[in-house]
Amino acid sequence: MRDEVFKRPIKKQFEFDESVVSVFDDMVSRSVPYYCDVQALISLILSKNLSPNAKVFDLGCSTATTLLEIFKLRSDLSLNGVDSSEAMIKTARNRSLAYLANLNLYVSDILDFDFSGSDAVILNYTLQFIRPIKREEFIKKIYSNLKSGGIFIFSEKLVYEDKKLTLDMIEIYENYKHSQGYSKFEIAQKRQALENILIPYSENENKELCLNAGFKSVETIFKWANFATFIAFK
């Protein structure tokens, strides 16, 4: 279904309710630049670096797009998805059945979920929705739940330390969304709905979270304007 959630005036903050879940795949593919390319890149990196039967957790897995991309390359892996939205997991389960993919999918708050013994953890465009006061503790949890040599891959929207550059990037991004068929009204509506819900960090702040948690290295593997994907090694 085509995303038309913000064509109507909104009266609440953004949440992943039924109205969003029903159009989520269209929404994210038109709202996040190079979304499909990022999923493909993550899948390729993990497929090259993980041992047979390695355990992968996608935290905030939404409709399981990333897990299904990995499954296409490495069906031997233990693929696990966690999302707090029951509607998201229902859609993910239906998709996994359609692909004949053996995915383990859980409805849970990722802050409370036990994913110990992981070989890889994925966190795509999810950390930005976690309250800043809880982010450092959560990244430390990811580090402690990964096995030695484990991989942490995450994607985030960014702010820049230079305020003018941040504003320029916001304008460039909103022009991108307009080119994807969103009206200026829809763009403004979503921006308002996400205010104080999606709180991005800078590239350096995201890297510092990983290094402070104990990861031995962290690199940016993809970046476009105010979006980036990172990889960290335990």
Curated annotation (Swiss-Prot):
Q: What does this protein do?
A: Catalyzes the conversion of S-adenosyl-L-methionine (SAM) to carboxy-S-adenosyl-L-methionine (Cx-SAM).
Concerning NCBIfam families, the annotation shows: carboxy-S-adenosyl-L-methionine synthase CmoA
User: Its GO biological process terms?
Assistant: tRNA wobble uridine modification
Write down what this protein is called: Carboxy-S-adenosyl-L-methionine synthase
**Could you describe the subunit structure of this protein?**
Homodimer.
- Which family, according to UniProt? Belongs to the class I-like SAM-binding methyltransferase superfamily. Cx-SAM synthase family.
Q: Does the keyword S-adenosyl-L-methionine apply?
A: yes
Tell me the keywords, alphabetical order: S-adenosyl-L-methionine, Transferase
Q: What is its EC number?
A: 2.1.3.-
